[in-house]
Amino acid sequence: MGRKNIKTITTCLFAALIFAACKKDGNTTGPTPNTSEKRKVFVVCEGSFGNGNSSMSLYLPDKDSVYEDAFKSINAQELGDVFQSMTRIGNSYFLCLNNSDRVLCLNEDLTLNKYLSVPKPRYVLEINESKAYVSSLYNDKVYIINPSTFSVTGRIQLPHMNTEGMALYNGKAYICTWDTSVNKIYSINTSSDQLEDSFTISGFAPQEVLVDKEQKLWVLSGNIAKGKPAAWTRIDPVTGQVLRSFYFPPKADPIHPVLNNTKDTIYFIEVNYDGGNENNGIYRMSIHDASLSAQPFIGAAPYQYYWALGIEPVSGNIYVGDPKGFIQKGSVMVFTPDGTKIKEFAVAVGPGHFYFEQ
């Protein structure tokens, strides 16, 4: 949602080349997936903004089977408008439908249980079996839900708008507010649900926060469209001290960072909307690196950009989503940990995130 205007502008530029390069994959199976498979890769397909065509694609690696619209095939209804993220708490899945103002609650077999009304939901952060936080675009609040009773139980006021990425560490939830005037992240005491502290970061507009193997926070900030260059800040959550700062080139637009399974290497996407190779592809850095890499680990082709990134827990394989301009079905590419491409398959429109289940 936050970058939809940029994606719309670039659609015309990419359209002709995207259609020419589109490859139909032959491994898509019938309409009803086998939800009893233990190893699953859920592909969160945003759809195109305002069209209500988001989808949940499902890949079963052990069967090499792809279901492009698993939710619709099981529930006989559309998912909603802009599928932003999903997570599992207990035996239920929670799906954030950003532009539908809903969090869908699914049973273990992917049947719809109910939905919660939350304005512009972005991400769900599990606190415990009876509490989770939901961030909310265009709002200065984090919403509290009970995953056991499927109810909205409260809200937490933040000082700024656009609550976005969240992380849990040592009884505190660290919250990003993707506001261009903000150079802080905020901590919430998860026992009292009260705003407790804030830490200054090295850039503006914090959007994502991760916790590495040494229990340090990594905050990704920036909003290139609004003139705020991107930066990484590594912070000690005990003292609030800034340990390292990394500043990206002016045109670099990093998004969707993830840690590897040992939490000692960060992977992220850089997006070049102009169709060039500079600052475009999958990048990675060790938590002990002294500088950012100038070259991508997995480069994007000319007039291509990536939008989804995830690392599978069992294999360590790297999953990358190509939205193909959000004007047709997207694709997912799978790479080994050393960057060798081993698989590509078609998914629904706009792959934006992955959720792995083992």
Model-based region annotation:
Residues 1-41:
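Bacterial Sec-dependent N-terminal signal peptides
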Residues 25-107, 139, 323, 328-329, ...:
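Acidic/polar, low-complexity intrinsically disordered N-terminal segments immediately downstream
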Residues 37-39, 90-92, 129-130, 170-171, ...:
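Short coil/turn segments that connect the beta-strands within blades of beta-propeller domains
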Residues 43-51, 95-99, 134-138, 175-180, ...:
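Conserved beta-strand positions in repeat-built beta-propeller and related beta-rich domains
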Residues 50-58, 102-105, 141-143, 181-186, ...:
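Structural motif
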Residues 61-63, 107-111, 146-150, 189-194, ...:
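Short loop/turn segments that connect beta-strands within beta-propeller blades
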Residues 72-79, 114-119, 155-160, 198-203, ...:
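Surface loop/turn motifs at the tips and blade-to-blade linkers of beta-strand repeat domains
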Residues 80-85, 120-127, 161-168, 204-212, ...:
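Repeated scaffold domains used in trafficking and secretory/extracellular systems
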